[in-house]
Amino acid sequence: MKFSPLVDELIQSLRCLPGVGPKSAQRMAFQLLERDRKAGAKLADSLAKAMSDVGHCQSCRTFTEETYCPICVSTKRGHSDIICVVETPADVLAIEAGGHFSGRYFVLLGHLSPLDGVGPEELGLALLEQHLASGDVSELILATNPTVEGDATAHYIADMAKRHELMVSRIAHGVPVGGELEYVDSTTLALSFNGRLPI
């Protein structure tokens, strides 16, 4: 059955969200149109405002409505000499939720992927290089994802940082807390053994 052009456009628009296929998009569209038009209008308004007003921090590249994000302007953290490099703004939120890091961030907004046309320029590495050359950074923590692309990105940035004689470290990878060994893949298990710590 074919829907009206506006309903069909709404369904197709919702499919741009990660993990949303045709059926899920249809259910969402129908929910908003049948039962919750007020929430649909609020969603449309919030989406329009976010798309027009949210940009990237001029220092770390995370999301913000201002020129600089709250972490970069913080008197406690904005002058930290430790920078943690992550792939996405969601990674910043995950680390912040843990509450164990009190330095600054640099958000790559992706990872090196030459086949997809993503090189150092797209990741803002010239800006990161400026931070490293400023003399205000003593340590770089690489928190890219443990994927082939994440590893390649981490190695590229580590080489860049070593030219500035900075301490460079990479977050540990291994068995998650509460995980059972029989369900852990062999690569993760190997990383866990290689990165074991004395107790």
Swiss-Prot record:
Keywords: DNA damage, DNA recombination, DNA repair, Metal-binding, Zinc, Zinc-finger. A zinc finger (C4-type) spans 57-72. Residues 81-176 form the Toprim domain. The keyword Chloroplast does not apply. Pfam families: RecR_C, RecR_HhH, RecR_ZnF, Toprim_4. May play a role in DNA repair. It seems to be involved in an RecBC-independent recombinational process of DNA repair. It may act with RecF and RecO. This is Recombination protein RecR. The gene is recR.
